[in-house]
Amino acid sequence: MPTSTYRHEWDCGLVSPTATAIKAMAIIKARPNDIFPFKVSGGSSAIVMGVNYDLLNTIGPNNLGLGPDPIKVTSVSADSFTFSTLAGHHRGAGQTITFKTFEKGGHVWLTQFGTFNSLDPRQYAYNTGATLAWALQAHNLRVAIGTVGSANLATAERALDALRPSTYLNVF
């Protein structure tokens, strides 16, 4: 299956004693239902290596009747984790998305890096929805780490750029 990728980076505000990349990732992993723009349900209330989860309402109410999107956490580190999609997920099995936080230029950043089947035309529509979901995830993280007011205008401009799929898609 030909695989393509997308990547989004969001400025989540100024680094401070309470807002660091490691602390931001710890919050995402400990409180996924406060940070993700959809419900994370399953084996644990926190993100844990090897645990399966169902993502609910990822593409609309009741996932537009398609059922939950099952995933498994396949990698975890202090500053990142990766989901792999399982059979029954709207993107199909075997896709990945990695969430990573880092510090650059005195700011905390959130990156979402995902793969998808480039031969399935629905995936491009899903990417548009994902862009909006990941923008909301970044906002929720800013709220959680207390940096909502410190993210600059470039963040909004980056969100608009992210809606232009050719900017962030890498087909190979």
PLM regions with names:
Residues 60-65, 88-93, 118-124:
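Short, cysteine-centered beta-strand-loop-beta hairpins and adjacent loop/turn segments enriched
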Residues 109, 115-171:
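A conserved amphipathic terminal alpha-helix motif
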Residues 3-9, 80, 96, 107-109:
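Intrinsic-disorder/low-complexity, polar/charged segments enriched in Ser/Thr/Lys/Arg/Asp/Glu/Gln
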Residues 1-64:
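Hydrophobic ligand-binding cavity/cleft-lining segments
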Residues 13-16, 102-104, 115-117:
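Solvent-exposed residues in well-ordered beta-strands and their adjoining turns
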Residues 84-87, 110-114:
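Catalytic Cys-His active-site segments of thiol-dependent hydrolases/isopeptidases
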Residues 65-104:
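Hydrophobic-ligand binding "helix-grip"
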